[in-house]
Curated annotation (Swiss-Prot):
Residues 1-16 form the signal peptide. GO terms for biological process: symbiont-mediated perturbation of host defenses. The keyword Signal applies. This is Allergen Arg r 1. One of its GO terms (molecular function) is amine binding.
Length: 159
């Protein structure tokens, strides 16, 4: 009996730390359906500070949502653009842009590839930490030796 309990405990630890296979774009788009996501780090140089995305009007049957997104402009205000995000397997398509989900926990963070760059997105409630450690692992693993640039810095409240 003790052996069975030990095996179950070991398997629970392994599955709790399993960071593979969570690449569904629709799970990423929906997130927790409240708040939004800030771009925390990217391998792209010169990315605008306080880049964000916020989904609303989620349509399960078409796997689409309205996306509001933008960044902090020179005056310190957040820009605001609206588009439709569509999930296609592990791809998020907004207009002519496609991002590929490398990892999502559907609640606190996502790692995506966009335009050849790796990006770490963190839910607006987790900018000070507490997001899934698999996102840090996948971001580091995917970017390899490419330097990471911090994008989330003293950002105003999300619109």
């Amino acid at each position: 009996m003790a052996l069975i309990i030990l095996l179950v405990a070991c398997l629970s630890v392994v599955s709790a730390d399993d960071c593979s296979g969570k690449t569904d774009a629709w799970t990423s788009i929906k997130g927790p359906k409240t708040g939004g996501y800030w771009l925390k780090q990217t391998t792209k140089t010169g990315e605008n500070e306080c880049t964000y995305v916020k989904g609303t009007d989620f349509k399960e049957n078409t796997k689409t949502a309205t996306y509001t997104y933008g960044y902090k402009d020179a005056s310190g205000k957040l820009t605001k653009t609206t588009g439709t995000a569509t999930a296609k397997g592990s791809d998020i398509v907004v207009g002519s842009d496609t991002s590929t989900v490398i990892y999502t926990d559907g609640k606190t963070c996502d790692v995506v590839k966009h335009g050849g760059h790796t990006e770490l997105w963190v839910h607006s409630s987790k900018t000070s930490g507490g997001y899934n450690n698999c996102c840090d692992k996948k971001f580091t693993e995917t970017r390899g030796s490419t330097p990471a640039n911090e994008v989330y810095k003293k950002c105003p409240g999300m619109p």
